[in-house]
Amino acid sequence: MSRHTDLVRSFLEQLEARDYREGAILAREFSDIKARSVAWKSEGVCSTKAGSRLGNTNKNRYKDVVAYDETRVILSLLQEEGHGDYINANFIRGIDGSQAYIATQGPLPHTLLDFWRLVWEFGVKVILMACQETENGRRKCERYWAREQEPLKAGPFCITLTKETTLNADITLRTLQVTFQKEFRSVHQLQYMSWPDHGVPSSSDHILTMVEEARCLQGLGPGPLCVHCSAGCGRTGVLCAVDYVRQLLLTQTIPPNFSLFQVVLEMRKQRPAAVQTEEQYRFLYHTVAQLFSRTLQDTSPHYQNLKENCAPICKEAFSLRTSSALPATSRPPGGVLRSISVPAPPTLPMADTYAVVQKRGASAGTGPGPRAPTSTDTPIYSQVAPRAQRPVAHTEDAQGTTALRRVPADQNSSGPDAYEEVTDGAQTGGLGFNLRIGRPKGPRDPPAEWTRV
């Protein structure tokens, strides 16, 4: 058995030996990552002077996610026309130490030109997008791509849509033609349509498909992968980390001391809050376990019990709280890491089905779990608004028109709503479905059922 196979097997066995199913070790690891990140900022190891300058602050989507000076992407294209060198983006090193990834935020209306300056100057061929334009009624990313029969113009750049296809239920692939000073280039964009902010997808399958497809489109030529979500940290960090580990597997360069903790820690030195929440950190472990499991099955056919041994790791250690259950689309077996089996997707979370009801005076998040409603339960209130079905602001252009949408090169920030505080995304309070409902106080008469003897 090769040394590479031994290292892969050792990592999987280590997960079981350390009893990751309890989750305590992963929680401690992620707390350590956050603590070190805070220390780096306070000690000046990771400075943000450029992004904090007066002329650049309105180019940051979120006030607390600012590009690190040491690894920030510096724009030189079109500087002679008065455009600055700052964009909220950082380089992340690949397995060979090169600038393999550009982690950036979703463009703002007044940074669309800067985004396309970045794509053109650094020869980006593939863009991975892990968010939607609008999520939960809030604008997360300005549309920087063209629609069918609707070209987009950003300064001197003209973008047209060549082709749009749906790879599966989660991923849309667009091929764009970008024109700048009479030169044409093709840029591919992969958009993951259903990854919740601060959360995780319902399975690893389509994430692995997205990363694999990106590498097929990228080919062996130069140029970094451009990866973004809304802030360019949480979901972006997961994608970069998954591709990084996958490259280690494909090149058989897993180091003897391989550690996902160290992988994420190193990425956080290059991009703020990469892999932003503990849930995303668990999902990363879950996905990497699937990658390692598949690799070991391909290279060691006699290790038949691996899948059974790793099933608890995938099912329990990395229990994923998601906002929706999406069916996984199986892919035909082929080369290494092309078909990854994952646990069945979880059922819809209670928060998406029932209204938030909290008993007065009870601590948030207490109780063993929700009580399922029965057919005999009497509704207490006449109208309940499900939490997951918030109104969504539709800001897209009308269909059926063919026009160039011109984006001004410079534009002031759109106001306070352009910024949002980015937290760790953890649930600070439970829903308390198991709690009984007390009598409502007020002028309303209680339901008749309460007065029956």
Swiss-Prot record:
<dbReference type="InterPro" id="IPR047170">
    <property type="entry name" value="PTN12/18/22"/>
</dbReference>
<feature type="modified residue" description="Phosphotyrosine">
    <location>
        <position position="419"/>
    </location>
</feature>
<feature type="binding site">
    <location>
        <position position="197"/>
    </location>
    <ligand>
        <name>substrate</name>
    </ligand>
</feature>
<dbReference type="InterPro" id="IPR003595">
    <property type="entry name" value="Tyr_Pase_cat"/>
</dbReference>
<comment type="similarity">
    <text>Belongs to the protein-tyrosine phosphatase family. Non-receptor class 4 subfamily.</text>
</comment>
<feature type="compositionally biased region" description="Basic and acidic residues">
    <location>
        <begin position="442"/>
        <end position="453"/>
    </location>
</feature>
<dbReference type="InterPro" id="IPR016130">
    <property type="entry name" value="Tyr_Pase_AS"/>
</dbReference>
<feature type="modified residue" description="Phosphotyrosine">
    <location>
        <position position="381"/>
    </location>
</feature>
<dbReference type="InterPro" id="IPR029021">
    <property type="entry name" value="Prot-tyrosine_phosphatase-like"/>
</dbReference>
<keyword id="KW-0378">Hydrolase</keyword>
<keyword id="KW-0597">Phosphoprotein</keyword>
<feature type="binding site">
    <location>
        <position position="276"/>
    </location>
    <ligand>
        <name>substrate</name>
    </ligand>
</feature>
<keyword id="KW-0963">Cytoplasm</keyword>
<protein>
    <recommendedName>
        <fullName>Tyrosine-protein phosphatase non-receptor type 18</fullName>
        <ecNumber>3.1.3.48</ecNumber>
    </recommendedName>
</protein>
<dbReference type="GO" id="GO:0005737">
    <property type="term" value="C:cytoplasm"/>
</dbReference>
<keyword id="KW-0539">Nucleus</keyword>
<dbReference type="Pfam" id="PF00102">
    <property type="entry name" value="Y_phosphatase"/>
</dbReference>
<feature type="active site" description="Phosphocysteine intermediate">
    <location>
        <position position="229"/>
    </location>
</feature>
<comment type="function">
    <text>May be involved in growth and differentiation of hematopoietic cells.</text>
</comment>
<dbReference type="GO" id="GO:0005634">
    <property type="term" value="C:nucleus"/>
</dbReference>
<keyword id="KW-0904">Protein phosphatase</keyword>
<dbReference type="InterPro" id="IPR000242">
    <property type="entry name" value="PTP_cat"/>
</dbReference>
<dbReference type="InterPro" id="IPR000387">
    <property type="entry name" value="Tyr_Pase_dom"/>
</dbReference>
<comment type="subunit">
    <text>Interacts with PSTPIP1.</text>
</comment>
<dbReference type="GO" id="GO:0004726">
    <property type="term" value="F:non-membrane spanning protein tyrosine phosphatase activity"/>
</dbReference>
<feature type="binding site">
    <location>
        <begin position="229"/>
        <end position="235"/>
    </location>
    <ligand>
        <name>substrate</name>
    </ligand>
</feature>
<dbReference type="GO" id="GO:0001825">
    <property type="term" value="P:blastocyst formation"/>
</dbReference>
<feature type="region of interest" description="Disordered">
    <location>
        <begin position="384"/>
        <end position="453"/>
    </location>
</feature>
<feature type="domain" description="Tyrosine-protein phosphatase">
    <location>
        <begin position="26"/>
        <end position="291"/>
    </location>
</feature>
